[in-house]
Amino acid sequence: TPLTSITILFAAFLVSAAPFAQAQTVTINGRDDGYRGIWYMNQPSGDEYVYKYSGGLGTYCAKHIPFAWYSQETNRTYFCYGGTDVNNSTLFHMVSYFDHTTGRVAKPTCVLDKRTDDAHDNPVINLDDQGYVWIFSSSHGTARPSYISRSVRPYDIDQFQLMWSGNFSYPQPMYYPGKGFLFIHTWYVAGRGNYMMTSNPEGTVWTQRRELAYFEDGHYQISGVWNGMKTGIAFNMHPAGKGLNYRTNIYYMESDDFGATWRTVGGTILDIPLKSKTNPALVYEYESWPRNVYIKDTRFDSQGHPLILFVLSKGY
């Protein structure tokens, strides 16, 4: 099936909005004197490669979106990354910006200490239509809390306030002017389920968490936005019982009404949450090859057709 013929409409939902819970104070709001990204490793491999992957991972991973956001009003690109101390002993959530007028970067602000050295807890960033800078602080699984923080003043990184604490992984917040955030993320509940929440324009009231897909042993997903109108999500699946390092197939869904309904490009309405690996969202079947599928990006062409960047592999 060509990518230009994939769409997903998912059943409309209405959930009651609830205000953010009061969050525990963990903010630091201190300026650092330079840039130190977190170094991280994962899963000793017992061979010449030593680890499954390792290195400087301050902007890890591909499923954390976005790490940077351009503001036309200030001519700055605001960005975040996973920082650390001189001993690489903890993960700081850092925010700064590049000023395109002066060609200089600001000294970064340390928003909070995540109290881990796991780069899966790296933050992502976005700006709302009033210029407030938002930081979504991830967690690797459910053992640690996740946070949502907002700048005290528009376009300013000096001070952030904690808006919410709870739990989410692989955060992908997209802001729709006049509507609010459509927040795509993973929630570890006996696996890796695909979820979403939406907010009011101010980002202070959110819907309850909504499950989009959860079958076999879960998924990794990557979302993208077209023209401020449409959100698309590409994801794979972990076949049941085969372990984390086995992932296959490509699925895709999109919404053009702020997450109320989701469709295939062909207009097929999906029964959400998706609960079977055989469903209309399936784009390519690779389980029988067998091949691992690593989804790396979801974009759109000028006409709004989805483009999915992925890697095929015989192993990990």
Task: Please describe what each predicted stretch is.
Residues 1-3:
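N-terminal secretory signal peptides that target proteins for export/translocation
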Residues 17, 21-25:
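Boundary at the C-terminal end of the N-terminal hydrophobic targeting segment
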Residues 24-316:
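Extracellular, repeat-based ectodomains that mediate carbohydrate processing or recognition
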